[in-house]
Amino acid sequence: MNIFYLHEDPIQNAKWHIDKHVVKMPIEYAQLMSTAHRMLDGEMYLGKTENNRNIKRWRLDDEREDILYKASHVNHPSAIWVRQSVENYYQMYRIYMATLAEYTYRYGKIHGSTKPSITLIRPPKNIPKIKGTPLPQCMPDECKVKYNPILAYRNYYIVEKNSFASWKNRSKPEWYIEKDIMNTWVGD
């Protein structure tokens, strides 16, 4: 679970997602927003996992119940961030939609997690109507850059995602350098 934030513009951000993330992240982005809906607007109950363990679940009393994903990774910093403010939620939605479009551009297909997009366009009813908060940097400390999640996530791509970084039908981002030629990296 993460939010790969490589550029302020969601369309450019999606273009710079590596292939693996263009495939994987739309579902995670939809899960993050679904979790916000369930936790903020739903009623908590104890459910069972496939292994018969107790698990907290949230039931919605409207059409969202059958459309949205189940709550997931509720205490992850990215999940907390999405539900902290309506501005955060809308930023996540724009990233999600741009990544869905990028998937179609690269692979010529509609991503499977497009289904909840119409429902997710509306934020949870009970989300705080406050300004956005800083995006969490969910990565090793060596990649983090204080007050700059964009540079931090670019570092993260270079340091941690180098072995499988590829961009189908896209040029490599100009900021992307190969890890083996990197001497030191910017950080704070």
Can you say where each PLM-predicted feature lies in the sequence?
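Sequence termini and other peripheral, non-core segments
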Residues: 1-75, 79-188
